[in-house]
Regions:
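Conserved ABC ATPase "signature" region
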Residues: 64, 76-93
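ABC ATPase nucleotide-binding domain signature region
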Residues: 5-10, 14-68
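H-loop (His-switch) and adjacent beta-strand-loop-beta switch element
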Residues: 166, 170-178
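Helical segment within the ABC ATPase nucleotide-binding domain
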Residues: 136-149
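H-loop/switch region of ABC-family ATPase nucleotide-binding domains
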Residues: 157-158
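Conserved ABC ATPase signature
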Residues: 97-101
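A short, proline-enriched helix->beta-strand linker immediately N-terminal to the Walker B motif
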Residues: 115-124
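Walker B catalytic motif
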Residues: 126-127, 131
Length: 178
């Protein structure tokens, strides 16, 4: 598999076909059984929005934690803080521990923090739709901008219409084999 700038690869296959495993290998979370993976540039992996979320920490502290997990410096995180906080729409709740948030509020925070990065290579396990209808519209626009700015997109999905909209290449996986 070789991808170059401008490539938009859609991964399709049944549950358990290897889509998420491939994304995790591309992200560096898994070592390949054979061969090697070489990636140039910053990888942003939107595989698990809840990764790194601490229910006992405040919303603000969770934004900082997610930023560090994404490889951002403290200065970069603080520079993005106002934008992320505003996007969440959570206002004073950001000073409260996440365990006091509803599931929708937690999803807003996790999505805003996870998508506040730049990506040379963007890995997505399904198209993300979080929150209520109004927030989903905002989230969709934000995701589109992230996808447009990414040099390379690898999107795992079950939805053929998404492949047609966003991908210029498709790889069908079955049992971990293309």
């Amino acid at each position: 598999l070789k991808l170059e700038a401008g490539d938009r690869l859609g991964l399709i296959g049944h549950n358990g076909s290897g889509k998420t495993t491939l994304l995790r290998a591309l992200s560096g979370a898994y070592e390949p059984d054979e061969g090697s993976i070489e990636v140039e540039g910053r990888i942003t992996a939107l595989l698990d929005l809840s990764l790194g979320i601490d229910p006992t920490a405040t919303g603000i502290d969770n934004i900082r934690l997610r930023g560090r997990i994404a490889g951002l410096s403290s200065r970069d995180i603080e520079a993005k803080m106002d934008e992320i906080a505003t996007f969440t729409g959570l206002g004073p709740f950001l000073a409260m521990p996440l365990k006091t948030y509803s599931a929708g509020m937690q999803a807003r925070l996790a999505f805003a923090a996870a998508t506040a990065v730049e990506a040379d290579v963007l890995l997505m396990d399904e198209w993300i739709a979080v929150g209520d209808a109004e927030f989903q519209k905002l989230a969709h626009k934000r995701l589109l901008k992230l996808v447009e700015r990414a040099g390379i997109l690898v999107l795992a999905t079950h939805e053929a219409p998404l492949l047609k909209l966003y991908c210029n290449k498709v790889m069908k996986l079955d049992g971990g084999v293309a």
